[in-house]
């Protein structure tokens, strides 16, 4: 036979991931789209709306659409959304344990100048409480789609097709490659983090520990970067001039 069920479990997630990431980056990095926002609104408002659009678009293109396609063609998988044998509380326990490591490490490295070159991704000078909440919420939504793709679609079918460690290797390689778009150091740092998230996802049979851990890392990085960035002023409840 030229084609069997294993081929679909291996190729469909990889094709979905490749197409979705190309589409995502072409849209969010499109200069005409940026001009649409920035030519109609003041810089700060345009920056916030463009970031919110980018994160919502990422959730849809990286997570929701691939999930719909893969659920239709691979109905035997739940892709880590639910588990019949592992209680959800296990995911919260693992996420809590990981947070004990993630928070201090991220707090330490997020203050460094090389990190502040990239974060926070919203490059406005004056931040209010609402700006911070919008920024954190946008990241939480985006990361749900991101984890649906990496720890759901790109893990469970590959484990069945390749075995646990080959699947983790492929998953982590792709995960690290995506982070090259930010910086080589971030790409290297994503390797152990990606392996740990894959192992916990397999252990808990769900994406939720990985998702909560990733949100914890993202929010810690964001809040630390906002606080330490020399070009950012936090003005609380005050309105921008």
Enumerate the predicted regions with their spans.
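N-terminal, membrane-interfacial amphipathic/helix-forming hydrophobic leader that caps
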Residues: 1-85, 222-241
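Juxtamembrane helix-loop-helix connectors linking adjacent transmembrane helices
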Residues: 36-48, 71-142, 156, 160, ...
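Membrane-interface starts of transmembrane alpha-helices
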Residues: 46-57, 130, 134, 162-171, ...
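Membrane-interface helix/loop boundary segments of multi-pass membrane proteins
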Residues: 113-124, 145-170, 199-206
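Core segments of transmembrane alpha-helices
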Residues: 58-64, 142-151, 193
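Hydrophobic alpha-helical transmembrane segments
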Residues: 11, 15, 88-96, 132-136, ...
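Hydrophobic alpha-helical transmembrane segments in multi-pass integral membrane proteins
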Residues: 64-73, 138-141, 199-213
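Functionally important transmembrane alpha-helices
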Residues: 29, 165-178, 184-241
